[in-house]
Curated annotation (Swiss-Prot):
Highest taxon of the lineage: Bacteria
Entry-linked InterPro entries: Ribosomal_uL18_bac-type (IPR004389), Ribosomal_uL18_bac/euk (IPR005484)
Keywords, sorted A to Z: Ribonucleoprotein, Ribosomal protein, RNA-binding, rRNA-binding
Function comment: This is one of the proteins that bind and probably mediate the attachment of the 5S RNA into the large ribosomal subunit, where it forms part of the central protuberance.
Entry GO CC: cytosolic large ribosomal subunit
NCBIfam families, per database record: L18_bact
Keyword Ribonucleoprotein listed: yes
Protein name: Large ribosomal subunit protein uL18
Assembly and oligomerization: Part of the 50S ribosomal subunit; part of the 5S rRNA/L5/L18/L25 subcomplex. Contacts the 5S and 23S rRNAs.
Regions crossing the membrane: none
An MF annotation (GO) of this entry: 5S rRNA binding
Amino acid sequence: MSIGKNVARLRRAKSTRVHIRKLGVPRLSVLRTGRHLYAQIFTADGSKVIAAANTLQSQVKDGLKNGKNSLAATKVGKLIAERAKAVGVDRIAFDRSGYLYHGRIKILADAARDAGLKF
């Protein structure tokens, strides 16, 4: 019997987070839904959110038709990088939460790199 798509994704995410925690650097975690994209930067131990950005916020929402396209991912990536640098974080580990490194996830990561985050 096969496991569900979301269960498999969560299993991959759990494995990745174990490896990231060993690195001891803040973690950029991404959540993708059908309509929106969310990004959060957690402390090295994972106990606090340092910075967050998503497609529901007015800085990202302005000028967008919807929050599920590549332009929205680019805006979220740039905004999360700006907010991370504002609190003194420039080096992170990218946690794709079990999603394939493709599409909106890849675009968000590239935009964050272009805006100055190192990972």
